[in-house]
Amino acid sequence: MALLLLAGCVVAGYWYWLCLRPVEIVAVHEEDNHASVLVKNFPLTDKGKINWWRKNKNLLKEKYNIPKPSSSGNFTIIFWLFGDGYQEEGKYDRRCFDDMKTKVNCIDKNAVFAVRKYHNDDIIFATYEGRYTLDKNSNIIKNE
């Protein structure tokens, strides 16, 4: 019983540590109204990802000048885990960035979060677990 309790405490402590690590923005790559943000330590839960966006969207605008909406108001920001860092294209499932003039300009495709806005409508959040809408009243609604 004590061993089970100890294991539970270790797992809870590890989860707590994972949730408290600060997000590190490694790089931002842009193409028109699309941006790819390479991150380490991104929040694990949908709620954590959306809350991180809401807390840091002004910092992203000030420091990286993203999002850059098109003339119709569209933009897309995709957050990718930086994982093993930049690599050569080699593997079939990598995202490469043409703004880097080197052969080592790709990452493994591991998108963890996306923020999209279409035609000045509501903002859409996309995660592995679902899609959410941030309406004009700042309410977050899970899409079915």
Per-region residue spans from a language model:
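Ser/Thr- (and often Asn-) enriched beta-sheet segments in non-cytosolic proteins
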Residues: 24, 76-78, 133
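Acidic/histidine-rich, surface-exposed loop or edge segments in extracytoplasmic proteins
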Residues: 30-43
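Intrinsically disordered, low-complexity segments enriched in small/polar residues
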Residues: 12-14, 62, 130
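A structural signal for short, hydrophobic beta-strand segments that form beta-sheets
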Residues: 20-28
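Non-cytosolic head/periplasmic domains of membrane-anchored proteins
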Residues: 82-144
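Mature extracytoplasmic domains of secretory-pathway proteins
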Residues: 40-110
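Hydrophobic membrane-insertion alpha-helices, especially the h-region
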Residues: 1-20
